[in-house]
């Protein structure tokens, strides 16, 4: 068995500390979620890992929603929940791939030979493709050595690097992904139809209750009536770079990083050329707005994408460019270069300079169309503002964020925040379990997204408090300041009885408290810099004792019933990110 480097810094926490309430709540929350997740899995999945529902294609209740029912489970295990969580979500992923490979459409030509091909969506948009990777893309946090996982990571990335002749999604000359609809069978190079989006006709009234509110299939079609302009590139496709960063963190092969940066850098250039606003359509010839009559704001899910809600006749803004921020975060993770953060910060500021005073109130635009900026609201445009601040740690970026909640706690303004939000999570789990137990749906009256509201994994609070991190969205990697490993069990996650609270973050420092709630057993925990060892730990201080580190992790021995504040100096984004666990590197 590989041993930890004996020359690395080892810390000791031996100050007797009665277990703080937050620590007891944290440990119990991990335990309670595990029990609730087991009940959820037993209720909605069969022995093969198939979701017990009617499998359909489409943007409302499609394949992505089926596996999204386990959103948060990979993080839950990586935080320290039992291995049963890992086993369940891996089983569900295997079942998901089989279930949606077998599932075929009749009327929708795109998926008549299977909704998945080569274990990947055949051809759909990255609003949904990304959601469908919410579980798989985070498996590397806990189980990067799984051979099937490794094979898929490389295959999926290859779909966007022209390594598969059946999937010519990427144009290296113009540095574009050639359509909003793309996947294992390549890009769709025609206008999409409402049927392409909605899926095959289906009985609705009396059988299903679509979560988008449609009362019949005609309304499902009407929902997507205007979703036609999908040819050419769109910021949504930047989410595909999460496949590239995953493959790079798995293999360390330069080709994955090179492709990721080539593609993101092309978007950096387009945004700069467009006055600092990321365009929502790039033509097949590489020109801004090339498939939309030269309109940089055109296209499905674009800056001008305001559609009619069929049930009410009202208008709904469905600009989805904000999901493109994933690509800039991936580029930052791969390089540590803050210019990728600058792009998004500059865009937020540029949009808000177009403010207007309307009826005596300052209003800020959120959409752009033929008549210029519109959809003015009292709140400044702030999509991605939390990411910008978190990645930069530039205090000037706090201007777009509320100084309450988690940010307020990190700023020292809400000392009771941890206990309050942890207690709230218990209420959330109770409510979801009650809803699940009252659910009267059957497999043949259940859409793929119906169980989602009952998913008891509540990891947002734990991610903030334990890791000092952002909750991953839509297939994105985990961005966090620290992560924990159990060196005795050789697994990811904080060891039994240990609790951690990140109390303060600065550009070069993290302050956290470690507690061992067991009065009997000593525990050993590894603290790693970042989710993927991207941050270098310079030193750690416990009281007056400062220990030099200069490595990506530290080992901490915590005596029975002991606890202490640990102040860690670090250099963020100093290392290349990797899935490799601490004991197998350095």
Predicted regions span which residues?
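Glycan-recognition and catalytic cores of secretory/periplasmic carbohydrate-active enzymes
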Residues: 2-586
